[in-house]
Amino acid sequence: MDLRTGVPITAAQAANGVFIWELRNPLYFKIRLVETPMYTRSRVFHIQVRANHNMRTALGLHKAYFNFQVWTTLTTISGQIYLNRFKLLVMFYLDNLGLISVNNVIRAVSFATDKRYVNAVLENHEIIYKLY
């Protein structure tokens, strides 16, 4: 859903993409928080994937934040190490696909979190398209 207007994003807007070799550093990965809930054997990584300026202009986006909450059973790994692994898997998927779009970023995250040590993934997206 477009955050500014409240209008649902159409399939054409979500599938609109650009070749990945035309963009330098299309995505910016940031770890926002690492939680270790008490009395559990799990760790929660709050990861934000942002579309870089080059990608936003190519796709006609004003703002594109993909927020993910990844619940894992990894208790000994640090946030930065998991972020590097997550980024590597997402970029590996997108490089093999060759096309980057809103749908493909979500599919790449699904690929990166489809591991035995990931219990659940919660998603929240802040996407705003340019109106002018």
From Swiss-Prot:
Instruction: Establish whether keyword Chaperone is in the entry.
Output: no
Listed A to Z, the keywords are: Host-virus interaction
InterPro entries membership: Gemini_AL3
Tell me one GO biological process term: viral process
How does this protein assemble? Homooligomer. Interacts with the replication-associated protein (REP). Interacts with host proliferating cell nuclear antigen (PCNA). Interacts with host retinoblastoma-related protein 1 (RBR1), and may thereby deregulate the host cell cycle. Oligomerization and interaction with PCNA are necessary for optimal replication enhancement.
Q: Which family does it belong to?
A: Belongs to the geminiviridae replication enhancer protein family.
Function comment? Increases viral DNA accumulation. Enhances infectivity and symptom expression.
Name of this protein: Replication enhancer protein
